[in-house]
Every structure is written in C-alpha cells, then in structure tokens.
C-alpha cells in the first residue's frame, strides 16, 4: 500500500478536526477555524502535487468551515481558490464554486468583483462546456453588474459578447437589442464612437437574417439619424447592397457585395456564418432559380 502523501495526511487531519466534538474549553468557532486552516494547508499541498480536483475539494471544505464561522470574506476567497483549482479540468465544479463566490461578494456589496466572477463563468460555459445559452445569461448578468458600478466599457464588452452568441444561436431579436444598446452607449464618447458602425452593421445583418428587409431599412435610417456619418461608411454601403440583393432575390449581386467587402475588410467567422445563412435564405426563396 502506497504511503499517504503530505496533502492527504493534512486533509485527513482537517476531517478529524471538523468531525470532532470539541473540548470543554474550546468553542465551536475555534474548531471550524482550525479545520479551515488545515483544509487550506491540504489544498495548497494538493496543488503542489498537481492534484487539482483534490485541491478544489479541500478549498471547498475550507469555505464551508469559514461559513460556519460567519467569515463571509474568507469563505468567498476560499470558494474562488476552489474554482481556480477546478478550472484545471473540472469546469462544472469550477462554475459551482464561482457561483458560491458570487453569493458572498453580492452579500458584501462588492458588485464589481461579482461581475468579474460572473464573466469567468460565462467564459467557462463558452470555452469549456460549449453551452452558448448559459454563456449569454452570464455575460448579461456580468454586464448589468458592471453597468451598476459605472464600468461602462467592460459592461458593453459583455453585452457585445452576449449579442454575438445570441446571433450564433439565431436568437436575432435579442442580439439586435444588445447591439443597439452598445451602440447607443458608444455614441456618447469620442473614444468609442468609431466602433458604432460595426455594431450597427451586425444589427442590420441580424435583421436581414430574420428576412425582414422593411425593418432593416427602417433601422438603417434610424442609425443615420443618430449619426449622419454612418451613411458614408463601408459598413452602411455593404448592408445597403445586401438589402437590395436580398429584396431582389439576386444571389449574384449578393455574392458580389460580399466579395467586395471582404476584399478590403476581411470577414470574421461571425460575419461569414450569418452571411451564409442569409444566402441560403435567398436560394430557398420560392420560384427562385
């Protein structure tokens, strides 16, 4: 039988302390404090041994001990340490630990830090579990918390990320609402005004993907009313050419507009995907040969 590692020995010592009845002269709090300290030591030892699941479990036990002592700040930090360990291959457990962290942060009024952790959850959903719908929800929550803390630029990035994902999920009305929201905020600053044309282009592409050319044209005019320089941009001219081609059911004109735009501004994966969807919609129109 292999000898116990130092980390395992510490973990068992912590378990023994947590399960003890305590002595005549010791308080319940001191028992949980000592057990929490031992779990923390065990967790760090597991990390040195690169046993990240075990490290996360030990940090989670530490967090529970801190909670029993009503030490919310320390409990939140322990849950976050658990999440960082779980992120090394255990995304579902990492999400659960981050959610616990957020509860403590919100209870303490630390919404900026709560937003940071919620954004981490969104990225795990996106990159590890590939659950785009839940990633959208987490990006939105993070964005709302950032907005409440006047971190407008970071909030807008979260809303934009959510909009991109909603479009991938073909939930275009939600995407349009968010792109317009980010554009409205961006118009208020000279530092971010330049990016507005990109948000409006994406919004128009989503509207065209819905097959609603009338609303797309109405929205384009609304955007020009908000910033009359938009009409002279490549983004507007591209969207306008696409609307004309889709309205006419002209696949050739549509393809030519896409090729011309891509020649100067390389299409990213998001635009390529939605443009292919729109093209398929033209080809599937009844009576089109």
UniProtKB/Swiss-Prot annotation:
Q: What is this protein called?
A: Vesicular-fusion protein SEC17
User: What domain of life does the native source organism fall in?
Assistant: Eukaryota
Task: Give the family, as the similarity comment puts it.
Answer: Belongs to the SNAP family.
What is its subcellular localisation? Membrane
This chain is encoded by the gene named SEC17
Q: How does it sit in the membrane?
A: Peripheral membrane protein
Q: Which GO terms describe its molecular function?
A: soluble NSF attachment protein activity; syntaxin binding
GO cellular component terms given for this protein: SNARE complex; vacuolar membrane
| Keywords recorded for this protein, A-Z | ER-Golgi transport, Membrane, Protein transport, Transport
Give the GO biological process terms. intracellular protein transport; SNARE complex disassembly
